[in-house]
Amino acid sequence: MQVEVDLPNHPYHIKIEEGCFSEAGDWVSHLWQKQMITIITDSNVEILYGESLVNQLKKQGFTVHVFSFAAGEASKTLEVANRIYAFLAKHHMTRSDGIIALGGGVVGDLAAFVASTYMRGIHFLQIPTSLTAQVDSSIGGKTGVNTSFAKNMVGTFAQPDGVLIDPVTLKTLGNRELVEGMGEVIKYGLIDDIKLWHILEEMDGTIDSILDNALAIIYHSCQVKRKHVLADQYDKGLRMHLNFGHTIGHAIEVHAGYGEIMHGEAVAIGMIQLSRVAERKNLMPRGISQDIYNMCLKFGLPVHYAEWDKDVLFDILSHDKKASGQFIKIVILPQLGSATVHQIPLEEMRDYLEK
């Protein structure tokens, strides 16, 4: 199956098919007539898929280089980006060449950031191998690196030339790495796709159930992401709905130390916490927070953060991109399957951090 992202300035397609990674070289050759490609990946994914992709691309006549960095959120930094710039320059990569991001969300965000800034921008493709990347971060053109102050504090908007999603790659993930992706999937059902929410309700929450339903949940998630990106490419309106749970979630990631709490795990905790307080403030119907709690618990996502410190978390989220002056925008749910943006005084976020 295929999802078309029909942006007027940069249309591209998302190919979703079991086993399609084995045809990645052919897919790339139909999109690009470039001479040189650099694959950016991490130390885990390189072992699993690096050699296969290199061989496929060489078979199509491409000159191929590989840059691999230590796996994990701690590598999503300007320091690692600088190392990649040096690698690209050493191999004389030009704007007529291309980058392929092969891996999970960290790889995709970092590789896309590098591609969008090296020589003021070169073309890139996304081949996501984690559930979080397949349903969310590889789509829509947000790139970024972390700082000590905030997650994704430095970044750009840059669309890929295409996205290749093979659900079979999920079978090589560890259980925790697979389950954390369900945080984003649950979010999609909550904000815009009640059919997806019902699919999740029918699943038993096991690893096998995630893998068995992967094609459906990836497709539904990509459709929701596509809708929001087409309506609001630069995150000024509707696309902000995708941030449900992320304001508190990102603060948790920073507080815990990048990589200690995975992104989807932090989003799950953030959705539950924000919803509970929004219900107390009569901004959301009673019971939704419990629905979210139960769904996250069923799939094995964390529902609490043991090191909770509201003052430190508030200081972190005051640097959030959704803050503007003395106000910040949060996403709430009028009902299951629907979202809206609500602006509040930044100081009121302290209420949302009360346990």
From Swiss-Prot:
The keyword RNA-binding does not apply. GO terms for biological process: amino acid biosynthetic process; aromatic amino acid family biosynthetic process; chorismate biosynthetic process. Its main location: cytoplasm. Its EC number is 4.2.3.4. NAD(+) binds at G105, V106, V107, G108, D109, T129, S130, K142, K151, T169, L170, K171, T172. Zn(2+) binds at E184, H246, H263. NCBIfam families: aroB. This is 3-dehydroquinate synthase. It comes from Streptococcus agalactiae serotype V (strain ATCC BAA-611 / 2603 V/R).
